[in-house]
Swiss-Prot record:
Cofactors demanded by this protein: Mg(2+)
InterPro entries named in the record: Cof, HAD-like_sf, HAD-SF_hydro_IIB, HAD_sf, HMP-PP_phosphatase
Gene source species: Yersinia pseudotuberculosis serotype I (strain IP32953)
Protein name: HMP-PP phosphatase
Task of the protein: Catalyzes the hydrolysis of 4-amino-2-methyl-5-hydroxymethylpyrimidine pyrophosphate (HMP-PP) to 4-amino-2-methyl-5-hydroxymethylpyrimidine phosphate (HMP-P).
Residues that bind Mg(2+): 8, 10, 212
Domain of life: Bacteria
TM region(s), chain numbering: none
GO MF, any single term: 4-amino-5-hydroxymethyl-2-methylpyrimidine diphosphatase activity
Keywords: Hydrolase, Magnesium, Metal-binding
A Pfam family it matches: Hydrolase_3
PANTHER family (alphabetical): HMP-PP PHOSPHATASE, PTHR47267
Family listed: Belongs to the HAD-like hydrolase superfamily. Cof family.
Length: 273
């Protein structure tokens, strides 16, 4: 019996309308009623997630910013990592050869110097929005992560530039095909979940996790049972071939799996693609 379940949000629980489906909500409530601790592990900001969970009538532990912050169900901070100030300064002052927009995340919000209202569509449920700013107006300390947003091919080229210039001072991951994240060295959902598990007197072997993108890789590979969404990025499926693939997000594949696990955990699971 797993005692904690960790869920990615976009592409795992959140459907195309950026909401959790009713069947999935029902399954999550059943899981909590069965005594399993709910944890939501996402690249989204804490303020964004609190709005989503409040709207959905859910509560649980939060791993946000792809592992840069861990909070309990009341919002009390349990763990955090920030980017080094000198790295933040370097990223903001370097003229990168890219058309990507740059986004910086701090405890007090999401900051960018480019106004792109289309990015707000994914945050309509919570009302979370970016704050337009001049980069030199922000402190260099207290920054969780950067996101670069543009087409995937441009991001692949940008990632090569960043890795060459930063020489192991940060970690990089694709949270979506069009979103490249720069994170503190050694920071990911897997490390954050390990910290949370220790806080709860659990081990990662006591946990199951669900995800669809490369920012889920460490979490999925380290838990007792990692489940890969049918709609997951091909690279994730290729790098974690040992893990079971379940249904797609739009089919509420997490709910289908949880209903099976809660009712017949001893039987082999067969997804409906």
């Amino acid at each position: 019996m797993y005692r904690l379940a960790a869920f990615d949000m976009d592409g795992t629980l959140l459907m195309r309308d950026h909401k959790i489906g009713s069947i999935t909500l029902n399954a999550l409530h059943q899981l909590a009623d069965a005594g399993v601790t709910l944890t939501f592990a996402t690249g989204r900001h804490y303020l964004d997630m609190k709005g989503i969970l409040s709207h959905s009538g859910l509560n649980g532990y939060l791993i946000t910013g792809n592992g840069t912050r861990v909070c309990d169900a009341e919002g009390n901070p349990l763990y955090g990592m920030d980017l080094p100030a000198e790295l933040v300064e370097f990223v903001l002052r370097t003229p990168w050869q890219t058309n990507a927009s740059i986004h910086l995340f701090r405890d007090d919000g999401w900051f960018t110097d480019r106004n792109d209202p289309d990015l707000l569509i994914a945050h309509t449920t919570s009302g979370f929005h970016f704050q337009l700013t001049e980069w030199d107006e922000l402190p260099l300390t207290g920054n969780h992560k950067f996101c670069f947003i543009v087409s995937h091919q441009e991001l692949v080229e940008l990632k090569a530039q960043l890795e060459q210039q930063m020489s192991g001072e940060a970690d990089f991951c694709f949270s979506a095909t069009d979103c490249l994240e720069v994170l503190p060295r050694g920071c990911n959902k897997g490390v954050a979940l390990e910290k949370l598990s220790h806080h709860l007197d659990l081990t990662l072997a006591d946990c199951m996790a669900f995800g669809d993108a490369m920012n889920d890789k460490e979490m999925l590979s380290r838990v007792g049972r990692g489940l890969v969404m049918g709609n997951a990025l091909p690279q994730l499926k290729q790098e974690l071939p040992q893990l079971q693939i379940i249904g797609r997000c739009e089919q509420q594949g997490v709910a289908h799996y949880l209903h099976h696990w809660l009712s017949s955990p001893h039987l082999t699971y067969s997804p409906e693609f």
